[in-house]
Amino acid sequence: MLKTSLEIKDGYAYITAEGSVNSANAAEFGNALAAVPEDITGVTLDIANIEYISSAGLRVVLNLKKRCGKKPFHIVNASSEVMDVFEMTGFAEIMDISPACRKISVDGCEVIGRGACGECYRIDDETIIKLYYGNADPAFIEHEKSLAKKAFVMGIPTAISYDIVEANGRKGVVYELIKSKTLGELIRMDDSRLDEYVAMYVDICKKVNSIHTNDPEIPSFKEANRADIANVTGITDREREMLYRFIDSVPDGDTCIHGDLNINNIMVQDGECCLIDMGELSVGMPMFDLSRILFSMVYANAEKGEFNSFYKMPSEKVTEIYEKFFRGFFGCDTAEEAEKNNPDVKWLYPLAWFRACMSMLKGERWGEAMRGRALGLLREKLIPFTERECGNMK
């Protein structure tokens, strides 16, 4: 028996279908799809429970696709049998069709990490799953997996990503299990090899920043930061406008940006560095990545004599690592010297001040002391720089 349902949400049509579609009920299927209004903004057809579709059913689907014209049209959750039909007939080449997720269970699996978006479970000796929290947007999950794959293809050393699966009612992405420790862990375990580990840190950052792309599906890091300015709290309208002015003045670029090149996101396997957490892969000028390291190890560092809970080491050790990293990356000790060889270095500190505002002046993660630090950087450093660079506000 064929069952269909139609829901219109914010002008978008969501259709679910169940059963088999053949010549006997194709007309019924067509009548159900004909109920989709002409003024919809797009269509998603969920066929998770469709067991079979004949050529008559395919023509009904094709007719709906033609009615949509250039509007978004997606078919999702096709079973392997139905997906085979779409691929054999060429429909998979003219429509956006996604197969159903493989289902697994994480019952009894070890939790090896938790983050803002979800949890990581060890599936077996070779694979892990990053299982997103239940409210995660499926499009975000697909986007993050796509970025991880693109990073690997472009030559960025990163974990191999497999498929999107469903586990215990939640969606996740299966990745290669990298049997190694992070660069941060190695530094904490053997301080005598600090220079060697910092050299590895420099090398992996240079490798990422040497890769360029014009792939339109990889987002602009600059534009992502611009969009986030609206979420900053506790500043005046003028200060917010200066944040917009600053980011608009930053040069565009086609360099690959990881977005969070800290030593906890770099695994070392068989002497080679491998990056994890590719969700912010973007393009922009290299100073974006380097400024985030500066922000994290200098402006977000604990006070002298205190313990840095993020890096799990004394604040003085974090400072030492950054100073060695800077010297290794630029071949000198100061930004003024580095700028003589690379004019883009003039953006290093301003972008770090900007990052302080974008991180510390949002949400409740940072305490009042850090919010005060960020406001000081905004008012005493970033705004004066922006006024010099762009001119005073009219």
Name every feature range the model reports, one short phrase each.
Residues K103-V111:
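Conserved N-terminal boundary motif of the eukaryotic protein kinase catalytic domain
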